[in-house]
């Protein structure tokens, strides 16, 4: 599969390594048009390339967006049309500035991203795990129920299945928290699943209790 990765920070670079290691072709982008990614691309080998943001979005059948939430409106929306987009962002007011609709609980960050990327098949995911845990805790040798959980949410069931397959290929278990709105709220900063080291069995128990 071809995967575009928007953002080369901790989550983006780690995910790119894992996707390439699982045999996928990866285009990694940053705000500098791919400049400065030479060492990462060399590490990933022939399955990876450095690109600009729009090129990475057009390249990927799946696109992982791992940039600060406050920059979401700078994404070239047309390039994401029809793509399965995994939004790994979280809203941090101290970093992103205040968004009244989020502060008032009217909507969620991923719903705002989805409204900007019209035509994209958006899934919330990869936002509740530290990058070091993403790097270290995947294990394809474990049964799914014993693997570290990565939570996903979305309104497009087919897109969620695609995201879940990628999660499983890199050694984790996808745990569905529901539709983009309700499910996204269950993944927000400070919730019972945010950055908690839960396997899939434990995650299901926590979600059912909530």
Language model: regions and residue ranges:
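Rossmann-like NAD(P)-binding element
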Residues: 45-97
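NAD(P)+-binding Rossmann beta1-loop-alpha1 motif at the extreme N-terminus of oxidoreductases
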Residues: 1-43
């Amino acid at each position: 599969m071809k995967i575009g990765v928007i953002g080369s920070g901790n989550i983006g670079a780690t995910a790119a390594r894992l996707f390439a290691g699982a045999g996928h072709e990866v285009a990694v982008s940053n705000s500098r048009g791919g400049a400065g990614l030479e060492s990462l691309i060399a590490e990933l080998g022939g399955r990876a390339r450095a690109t600009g943001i729009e090129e990475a979005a057009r390249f990927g059948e799946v696109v992982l967006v791992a940039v600060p939430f406050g920059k979401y409106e700078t994404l070239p929306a047309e390039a994401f049309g029809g793509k399965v987009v995994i939004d790994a962002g979280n809203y941090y007011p101290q970093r992103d500035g205040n968004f009244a609709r989020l502060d008032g609980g009217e909507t969620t960050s991923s719903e705002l991203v989805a409204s900007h990327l019209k035509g994209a098949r958006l899934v919330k995911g990869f936002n509740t795990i530290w990058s070091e845990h993403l790097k270290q805790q995947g294990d394809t040798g474990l049964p799914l129920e014993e693997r570290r959980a990565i939570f996903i949410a979305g309104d497009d069931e087919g897109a969620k299945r695609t995201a879940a397959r990628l999660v499983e290929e890199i050694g984790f278990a996808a745990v569905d928290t529901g539709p983009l709105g309700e499910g996204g709220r269950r993944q927000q900063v400070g919730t019972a699943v945010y950055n908690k080291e839960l396997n899939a069995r434990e995650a299901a128990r926590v979600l059912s209790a909530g």
